[in-house]
Structure formats: C-alpha cells, structure tokens
Amino acid sequence: MLALLKQFSEKRFVWFLLAFSSLALESTALYFQYGMGLQPCVLCVYERLAMIGLFVAGTIALLQPRVFILRLIALALGLFSSIKGLLISFRHLDLQMNPAPWKQCEFIPNFPETLPFHQWFPFIFNPTGSCNESQWSLFGLTMVQWLVVIFSLYVVILTLLLIAQVIKTRKQRRLFN
C-alpha cells in the first residue's frame, strides 16, 4: 500500500486535488463572508491561513511532483498547516461548545510584525465576528465541526503520503512479469 501511495504522490493529479480542494474551501469561506454576510472571527482567520498553507503546499508539489525534495517540502508544509488548522479548529470548537465569559478569543489577529496579513489583505484576514457564535450548519454540524473533519482528513492523508515517502518498501516478486 505504501508503494502505491508513493506512486500516487508522484502524480500531478494528487497535488492538484490538494490545491484545488483547499482553494475551493477558501473560496467558500469568502462566499460565506461576502455573499451570505457571515462575519469571520480571529480563529476563522487563522483557519483560513492554514487552508492557504495547504494551497501553497499543493502548488509547490504541482510544479514538479517527481522531484523528491519538492514533494517533501510540500508534505511538510501541508502537514504543518493541517495540524495547525486542526488544533485551531479544536480550540474554536471548544469556545463554541463550552462558552464562558473568561474564555474569549482576541479581536485583533496575532500575526508577526513582519507578516501583518490582516493589514496586507484585510478582505481575507480582517476579523469582525465573535468566536463563540455558530452562524451556519449543514447536516447538523457547524462550520467549525466541518473544519475539524476536513483538517483531520488532510492530516491523515498527508501523514500516510509522508510515511510512504520515507519508508522503503520491498519490491514484490512476480512470477510472470
């Protein structure tokens, strides 16, 4: 199975799927903000940044998927982004499921001074909502619960792809081939 996953990771389609899915989810978030009028909170902004990290990872490997170092960089960036997104989503979910006056998220994003994304791209990274509010649901799951599911899937898939890159598999001996 690992050999098959390694072969898949050398195909452009896998990395296109990663880049496209994260871009589609980012576009959906922007539609929720500007089309439906839902206000993003600070944690939503951080989750968007993690999704953009996944898009960048997919784009890096899409350039030349057969080059091992590019695949490794893309997998590392994608795994880092998906794990950070999952951890932020868990924190966000905790704020929504267990609201308390002492558990609040900040109002201004805490980006490094050298990368003030909320000032450079305010149409994407400017938070205007509260983290405690659940504004949308689908099939009984809130948007944050869906993000936990999505980031979990990304973590599992990218972890398996990374393991397939570093573990050597034995070639199967075939009788008639």
From Swiss-Prot:
Disulfide-linked positions: C41-C44, C105-C131
Transmembrane residue ranges: 15-31, 50-65, 73-90, 146-164
Cytoplasmic side: 1-14, 66-72, 165-177
Keywords: Cell inner membrane, Cell membrane, Chaperone, Disulfide bond, Electron transport, Membrane, Oxidoreductase, Redox-active center, Transmembrane, Transmembrane helix, Transport
Membrane topology summary: Multi-pass membrane protein
Periplasmic compartment spans: 32-49, 91-145
Example of a GO MF term: protein-disulfide reductase activity
GO BP term (any one): protein folding
SUPFAM superfamilies assigned to the protein according to its UniProt record, in alphabetical order: DsbB-like (SSF158442)
GO terms for cellular component: plasma membrane
Compartments where located: Cell inner membrane
Source domain of life: Bacteria
Function comment: Required for disulfide bond formation in some periplasmic proteins. Acts by oxidizing the DsbA protein.
Family: Belongs to the DsbB family.
UniProt name for this protein: Disulfide bond formation protein B
Origin species: Haemophilus influenzae (strain ATCC 51907 / DSM 11121 / KW20 / Rd)
